[in-house]
């Protein structure tokens, strides 16, 4: 076995021969990362990405200064979708090591699940993976129900059924109940709703190749909220939380939905489909109706919903939308505590009316007259949240996945958002 490369930390600048802005230096003992106090976690993550790029696949984090957050920053940059990597971790106290191990278990699960090819991860497989993960960490405190195919239509889940019926792989709704109280009548504290589109071709509003080639990741919202619930449980979550995953392929076939179709939802809303590539909101609507029926204190939905959010924020931040200023502030505080990037974008009452249809109450996409696509998408979802002005957060997961490597990240999934949502659930 290859001997591990030692990685140490220093608060002293690198020797001038390495350059004025050098973040690491190499000597006979290994590699030293030179912290400057400005953005130490980011520096460690960027250095780890460079170390991986050197082809070094076995490292030992050695010496003073390592804690769980710094170890985790290293792993975020070091991990990649190809090949294997081995890290020998430094000595940490029990609490720090447990936190690190939990992150490695859950957030790596999220990243690996999002990175999985669509051929391997269809709607049923995604739902079952979520069940397996939560059951593994929660045991008998979990019950669940999986509804699929024509049963969805018969039970009124018309958005999910409509989007998913064009694929040979049946659409699936996972309804999972984490109830640590043992009381079947216990109130539901929170509901998590995730978009689980396991491949998105755009349907008849078909995507170009450059926009379709990463669409195995369109289930990133479902993976994120699943990971968040699992991580919160491992952090001691003692309140009842329900998880709803809306899983489907969005494909073209003789049975696929078409432009001009009208979907009638269980809450009476009628939606005209004018863009089959705006399918995520159609499936989330079913999950939000179920979540609202639980009367929880809060509803959090997560979805790789719009390109508009990425246009605004790039892949560097998740976009947050809410009418509830206090709850939005709590999530942003959780994000700050967990060192995860969230940014609040506008959501106002007028966004709810910017989806006009000549044939139904709502259009599933805004017209050219209303170009704030991420905000109008959130406005659409609000029509399916019973008390949308309080206790509801919508996360447009623009930071979930990167098509190409950058300074801090390999190509693929990031796992960002899991810790923030878990923090909010356990606060």
Curated annotation (Swiss-Prot):
Q: Which residues form the active site?
A: 207, 281
GO cellular component terms, A-Z:
cytoplasm
Sorted alphabetically, which keywords does the UniProt record give?
Aminopeptidase, Cytoplasm, Hydrolase, Manganese, Metal-binding, Protease
Free-text cofactor note: Binds 2 manganese ions per subunit.
Give start-end ranges for the coiled-coil region(s).
none
Detail which positions bind Mn(2+) 1.
Answer: 200, 277, 279
Q: Which GO terms describe its molecular function?
A: manganese ion binding; metalloaminopeptidase activity
Query: Which cell locations does it reside in?
Result: Cytoplasm
Q: Which reaction does it catalyse?
A: Release of an N-terminal amino acid, Xaa, from a peptide or arylamide. Xaa is preferably Glu or Asp but may be other amino acids, including Leu, Met, His, Cys and Gln
Q: What CDD domains does the annotation carry?
A: Peptidase_M17 (cd00433)
Q: What is its EC number?
A: 3.4.11.23
The record's section on InterPro entries has: Leucine_aapep/pepB, M17_PepB-like_N, Pept_M17_PepB, Peptidase_M17_C
CC cofactor? Mn(2+)
Residues engaged in binding Mn(2+) 2: 195, 200, 218, 279
The alphabetized list of GO BP terms reads: proteolysis
HAMAP family (UniProt xref): Aminopeptidase_M17
* Family recorded in the similarity comment: Belongs to the peptidase M17 family.
User: What functional role does this protein have?
Assistant: Probably plays an important role in intracellular peptide degradation.
On subunit structure and binding partners, the annotation says:
Homohexamer.
Q: Please state what the protein is called.
A: Peptidase B
Q: Which source organism?
A: Shigella flexneri
